[in-house]
Amino acid sequence: MIAIDIAAEKLDFARTVGAHRTIHGDRENDIAERVREISGGGAHVSVDALGNSVTCRNSISGLRKHGKHIQVGLLSGAESMPAIPMDSVISNELEILGSHGMQAHRYPAMLDMILARKLQPAKLVGKTIHLDELPTHLAKMDGFNGTGVTVVDRFR
């Protein structure tokens, strides 16, 4: 797995949860080329979890022939119409999939993996907050601060 970000702390975090290699996006002239170099021809699967037109394009451009791109990050506002490199999509027979998350019927298999400790979602939690703090945290989401996900775990 190759993780790409512009924040060193997030790349460090990615290594702790399984990234084999990392790329600091601000230090590379051509991120897609770097992915192809590291992976020996391009990624089999890419995921844009950020929802940014640049990350979406780079993610698709770093795929190998017959690769699959999964768009999880929501592209909205000015980012809602990314420039998709359709020439590469067609010539490399790429697959592009949009996803809002796992289908409910797959939850039992995921929960079995958690019970077997094959998945450890607690490692992805960066911060826990009280429900009263939620509006403040939601308002700051576009700043992409911190690592991991924030979980509301206190309600009273």
Regions picked out by a protein language model, each given a short descriptive name:
Residues M1-N58:
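Adenosine-nucleotide cofactor-binding segment
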Residues A8, R57-S61, A104-R156:
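C-terminal hydrophobic helical "lid"/dimerization subdomain
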Residues L63-K65:
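Helix-to-beta-strand junctions that scaffold the AdoMet/dcAdoMet cofactor pocket
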Residues G67-H69, E95:
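Short glycine-centered segments of the SAM/dcSAM-binding site in methyltransferase folds
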Residues V72-G73:
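Acidic carboxylate diad motif detector
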